[in-house]
């Protein structure tokens, strides 16, 4: 009440202030001055003119003066009309002004409405109020004015025509979200014009119309964005990226909501370009997860451009560098797969648009099914690698420096090898892809193997290649059971291999040819791309990546090649051939097992080593299965034989790889030769034992005879020829080593291979042969046992060191693996010093001799032998 009384007093004082002539009435001039001075922030100039024109409505008695009674009634009648109009505006849509007093028309501007309201309201009070002029007091007038101001402050009674649009817009925000920017722009203009300039409403009204157009333009722009995003979503769906599409829709809706706000807060007079920029800025204000979306669409940031460009450009650059070091003719072929990958990545960029980082992984996973995942698979793995290890430019110089010495020494021989390899590549069809991928960054395999394992687990869930994993696990489990069932091992072996053939055929029929091609394509890429550069460590690393379907996707670079080659009809043909060979090899090896004690000790040793290297790249394979365990320590020769190569795009590659890796193992065991020398007699006895063993295998192994009847005949011839070639090639690089020493090392390598296989597939026949051979070699058992114990104790520690060293230096891989194989070889030699040397040879050599492409691969092996010596 006290406030109300003060306001009334203010109205009275105001009236008397302007009633100067007689202090009781207001003339037309005085009333005009009062309205202009006191109500200028309420009324528009047009309203003041309307009051002046319609002054006769206020001057009811037509005496030319307005008394206080007339003034009070007229003002409150007018304020009542304004209040009702304000309430109707607040409760209805904008521009729909209620006319409780029967206004004649709506001009589209609140100003005109207020003028009409004034006119109507005053006309209705005309009959009721008769105001004699000069009867009002200035105190009454000031009270009236304060009442008007109070109404203006009242949140419900915003009677000002100037602020009406603001209240209206604020109220209608919840209903019309796209107009929110208009009201905000008006608020800004009105705050600026708070000084009370009566011309502000005109300026505000024009921006209102302009801002309406802006908001409609914003809506149209948002709809355009929706249309574009829907087009992107359709494109993504066609390529199998529904997940990325959902992200695009979410992002599109957010962008539409935010862009009107940001655009209209720019001044209403802004151009459409400014609005687009504002919309982009509004979307850029999203969380960081959404930020790359708009950047990918309109303003790609340096990070986004760098990642795909690095992913695409880095492949050709690395491939060209490594290929140029090896052969100029191969360089022309090598960049082709990266170009295809770059096209895929470019398409991914255009299709994904805003969703580059948001939905990168889901998109790639789904798209891999449609595109068969070659380049996309690599894109994911390589981007993850690049995010963790940037810049890639640092990786290439390190590798180039490391391999530079090896390249110079092997350049002359690579000239001849590469010419033959060129023919091999043309015959191999899409094997060029695997070469290029292998040449990309072999050193990265070891460094990124930790990430690779996690990626393999993720990728295997989405990629079709993972369908072959159950078969491999069943294989591992069944082969493990072979060790524990000594009585029925031969029978189970035959059944298992028959089953494996069916399984592999089934998986291939289900469209998971990449499973069969996966390991195989990695095998050829290792000899082709790493010949002169990587030496032993990287060849071992690559071969270890080949092993096991559980790790078949560990290396994202390798996995990218699988899908493309698996569609090749030649690849499918070679799959069948390689399956038959694998059945034959497994059957032959099944009869050559070692006693179960050695098997258990090997398993324990490998498990101990595996526990220390769980973070290790090549040795990341699960250690629970003996089959996988043997892969880790088994030499590349054995790796290229069975599950490492379920099917090859080029059968010759498989054979070549097995032959090619033998001298690598020989060089890695130069130290072993000094520790455990054997005599010519042992070698001769070993050869005789091998011939006997081959004969017994021919009699007892029906599977191998049915699968490949001519294999064993070639096996008897191949060891001597292979030994001669390898001894010559090794002589060139290491003249100090005698030919007999080379043969000895070769036999030891092969012995190691078959002893490990024998550990899985021991049989009564082989045990009988083993006892016979053990009697001949009792002389050297004590010496070998001591050395084996020393090395086996040291090997877990070496493995542990290897897990940390592999991330920083690739050369440590070769050294550690060499020592581990030496330890295992010494450990095995206490049981079978010279028993099986030709076994591995007989399996690997016929594979190399059956195909014309074997010799180039064997010749390419020589640079690897050079690489092993410096790394040791």
Swiss-Prot record:
<feature type="compositionally biased region" description="Polar residues">
    <location>
        <begin position="699"/>
        <end position="708"/>
    </location>
</feature>
<dbReference type="InterPro" id="IPR034325">
    <property type="entry name" value="S-100_dom"/>
</dbReference>
<feature type="compositionally biased region" description="Basic and acidic residues">
    <location>
        <begin position="296"/>
        <end position="307"/>
    </location>
</feature>
<dbReference type="Pfam" id="PF01023">
    <property type="entry name" value="S_100"/>
</dbReference>
<feature type="compositionally biased region" description="Polar residues">
    <location>
        <begin position="538"/>
        <end position="570"/>
    </location>
</feature>
<dbReference type="InterPro" id="IPR011992">
    <property type="entry name" value="EF-hand-dom_pair"/>
</dbReference>
<feature type="compositionally biased region" description="Basic and acidic residues">
    <location>
        <begin position="486"/>
        <end position="505"/>
    </location>
</feature>
<feature type="compositionally biased region" description="Polar residues">
    <location>
        <begin position="718"/>
        <end position="729"/>
    </location>
</feature>
<feature type="compositionally biased region" description="Polar residues">
    <location>
        <begin position="117"/>
        <end position="127"/>
    </location>
</feature>
<feature type="domain" description="EF-hand">
    <location>
        <begin position="46"/>
        <end position="81"/>
    </location>
</feature>
<feature type="region of interest" description="Disordered">
    <location>
        <begin position="830"/>
        <end position="872"/>
    </location>
</feature>
<feature type="compositionally biased region" description="Basic and acidic residues">
    <location>
        <begin position="571"/>
        <end position="584"/>
    </location>
</feature>
<feature type="compositionally biased region" description="Basic and acidic residues">
    <location>
        <begin position="218"/>
        <end position="235"/>
    </location>
</feature>
<feature type="compositionally biased region" description="Basic and acidic residues">
    <location>
        <begin position="730"/>
        <end position="751"/>
    </location>
</feature>
<dbReference type="InterPro" id="IPR013787">
    <property type="entry name" value="S100_Ca-bd_sub"/>
</dbReference>
<feature type="region of interest" description="Disordered">
    <location>
        <begin position="774"/>
        <end position="813"/>
    </location>
</feature>
<feature type="compositionally biased region" description="Basic and acidic residues">
    <location>
        <begin position="324"/>
        <end position="348"/>
    </location>
</feature>
<feature type="compositionally biased region" description="Basic and acidic residues">
    <location>
        <begin position="664"/>
        <end position="684"/>
    </location>
</feature>
<feature type="compositionally biased region" description="Basic and acidic residues">
    <location>
        <begin position="849"/>
        <end position="865"/>
    </location>
</feature>
<dbReference type="GO" id="GO:0046914">
    <property type="term" value="F:transition metal ion binding"/>
</dbReference>
<feature type="compositionally biased region" description="Polar residues">
    <location>
        <begin position="774"/>
        <end position="793"/>
    </location>
</feature>
<dbReference type="InterPro" id="IPR042937">
    <property type="entry name" value="TCHHL1"/>
</dbReference>
<feature type="compositionally biased region" description="Basic and acidic residues">
    <location>
        <begin position="592"/>
        <end position="608"/>
    </location>
</feature>
<feature type="compositionally biased region" description="Basic and acidic residues">
    <location>
        <begin position="365"/>
        <end position="375"/>
    </location>
</feature>
<protein>
    <recommendedName>
        <fullName>Trichohyalin-like protein 1</fullName>
    </recommendedName>
</protein>
<feature type="compositionally biased region" description="Basic and acidic residues">
    <location>
        <begin position="399"/>
        <end position="435"/>
    </location>
</feature>
<feature type="compositionally biased region" description="Polar residues">
    <location>
        <begin position="801"/>
        <end position="812"/>
    </location>
</feature>
<feature type="compositionally biased region" description="Basic and acidic residues">
    <location>
        <begin position="164"/>
        <end position="190"/>
    </location>
</feature>
<feature type="region of interest" description="Disordered">
    <location>
        <begin position="117"/>
        <end position="759"/>
    </location>
</feature>
<feature type="compositionally biased region" description="Basic and acidic residues">
    <location>
        <begin position="142"/>
        <end position="155"/>
    </location>
</feature>
